Amino acid sequence: VAAHVSPLTDHLKDPVGIAARLIDTPYLWGGRTAFGIDCSGLVQLSHAICGNALPRDSDMQRTGVGELIGEGADHPALKRGDLVFWKGHVAMMEDEATMLHASGHTMSVVREPYADATKRIGHLYGLPLAYRRP
């Protein structure tokens, strides 16, 4: 049997690793495939491949996924897998300083320093609204 084949019941365990495989995928509002994906689709698909059902849209993810760990400028040290929410946007932390997201700025899935992204996104949408740990 080929090494890349596994039973349908097997699930991968790392949504961040799945999201990283989608770097350079084109941005497509409403998309959730490797042909085009948006920010909440990236989070939903990455978790679905790992066997975790998440809501489709970022506003529903912001209120219904995991544990709320902070709001606005108030948050603990961010960890791999934490979700960061702005109005109409979500990103997934790859580590404490880097995030993965489907960016309308680059029109693709990118790896970006959290500090740089927060500054750039903040000019349009302000501080993140919430931080959640799935």
Describe each model-derived feature in a short phrase.
Residues 2-7, 32, 68-72, 94-134:
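Aromatic- and glycine-rich peptidoglycan recognition patches
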